[in-house]
Amino acid sequence: MEKARPLWANSLQFVFACISYAVGLGNVWRFPYLCQMYGGGSFLVPYIIMLIVEGMPLLYLELAVGQRMRQGSIGAWRTISPYLSGVGVASVVVSFFLSMYYNVINAWAFWYLFHSFQDPLPWSVCPLNGNHTGYDEECEKASSTQYFWYRKTLNISPSLQENGGVQWEPALCLLLAWLVVYLCILRGTESTGKVVYFTASLPYCVLIIYLIRGLTLHGATNGLMYMFTPKIEQLANPKAWINAATQIFFSLGLGFGSLIAFASYNEPSNNCQKHAIIVSLINSFTSIFASIVTFSIYGFKATFNYENCLKKVSLLLTNTFDLEDGFLTASNLEQVKGYLASAYPSKYSEMFPQIKNCSLESELDTAVQGTGLAFIVYTEAIKNMEVSQLWSVLYFFMLLMLGIGSMLGNTAAILTPLTDSKIISSHLPKEAISGLVCLVNCAIGMVFTMEAGNYWFDIFNDYAATLSLLLIVLVETIAVCYVYGLRRFESDLKAMTGRAVSWYWKVMWAGVSPLLIVSLFVFYLSDYILTGTLKYQAWDASQGQLVTKDYPAYALAVIGLLVASSTMCIPLAALGTFVQRRLKRGDADPVA
């Protein structure tokens, strides 16, 4: 007798699982960057439009497919058509790539969390040099937060070619991160369903606490004004619309197979349309809410740096030209500098290299995303707060909850097709399959803890999923609407939920959403082609800054392999099915 499929304890567990998976680090470190780059408040216009015409329809489609077929990604697409099993395989491959490197972020968060209990915070000051006559040269040229990230955390090599060895402290943190993930997925929906209550809700508690603290910081209003002041001209920028569509697409986690896996554990009568709307709205609200928190903190950091710059320049000019204490202010500094340059040209030119141009606007314009925002900009702001240890613990605990929540979805996308397979599940219990997946990912993930690990992390982060996911979701929409049949799919949903599918969803699925995906695919493909030689940012310890370098030939080969290994699953699986059927038909033909 076939074993009954496990179910979520209730629909709330399912919603929390989807929120925990979809709401991730991208909401905290990419959306604020896009707001900063594309006109602050005006970026919300293309973002909300793309949410309505792309995000909600595609999320509803994946949830409906999972709930209707009641299988993981491979089984679900094979049921729709035997020629489409490669779509599910491609999703599993992409999720496997993501799991390989994504948990390294959780390892870094653990590393920073453990160091957050020190007083003072280890990234708040530069260490002394070897003979204790001054500060470390690399740290002085960079900053204490950059030094802690690049040297103490990553111990980064000067280039991708110099791999170095595995760093044992980050490696232990990665081992811990995978152990936590394994314990969370050990019993399938039974254990995951309980964990997601925490991973989905606790980040909001921390964000609310941070919002209250952020709004009380000196200079927070400067950051919020910068965010909410719209630059209307950006609405005419095609890249603003492209990036809005991209952010919606990737922040919801479409194409990985995780949403299909989660929905497959629903009751058939579950209202997946309502849940798709709820999850997508909460995801977008979180991005905007996190941006308010980020820009209040960012405003504090920018104001702190700006006022520090003013103090240093004022002190330098006061001491050099014997000015009266307190004479120089923010309002007259530029005017006095101009006067001193004309009145004492030789003296002023000698000290000119030490005189910085202090500008609050330029501080706010400095755009940072990804790990730079999470582990450098935020820590720069935290170190200047009162009771900095508390704020550091809260922040990195929040990052962990977001990261672990996303990892639960990533691993579900891999595990569900494996446990659905009768061949595998008949020989291995669920706990063993989960353990093997975690062990393999952890072992491969050790590459990212090497001295060149951060460069490999960037390669996987930039190229493992982008084009592959666009192609996967494009094939998904075409498969449902034109292979399985939109009318047939519509009648299935009505039979399951008792509700008719509105014309809006059908128009989006059959026309608008696929056209948007094709547009994104063409944009990214042309962008890669026009870019020419692919480059990466390498850390130069002698300068204390990042420098641009060309990827070596073997790295380009890895990038090509990452893209091809997932996308080629779709045509190869279809070809394999075709050949298999032809052979069977040939065997069935009578001998003449």
From Swiss-Prot:
| Keyword Lipid biosynthesis applies | no
Q: Where is the signal peptide?
A: none
Side Cytoplasmic, residues: 1-5, 64-79, 187-194, 263-276, 411-431, 487-504, 576-592
What's this protein's name? Answer: Sodium- and chloride-dependent transporter XTRP3
Question: Which family is this sequence assigned to?
Answer: Belongs to the sodium:neurotransmitter symporter (SNF) (TC 2.A.22) family. SLC6A20 subfamily.
Instruction: Name the Gene Ontology biological process terms.
Output: amino acid import across plasma membrane; amino acid transport; amino-acid betaine transport; glycine import across plasma membrane; glycine transport; L-isoleucine import across plasma membrane; L-proline import across plasma membrane; proline import across plasma membrane
| Ranges per topology, Extracellular | 27-42, 101-165, 216-241, 298-389, 453-465, 526-554
Q: Cystine bridges: which residues? A: none
Which PANTHER family does the entry mention? SODIUM- AND CHLORIDE-DEPENDENT TRANSPORTER XTRP3, SODIUM/CHLORIDE DEPENDENT TRANSPORTER
Q: Which gene encodes it?
A: SLC6A20
Membrane topology per the record? Answer: Multi-pass membrane protein
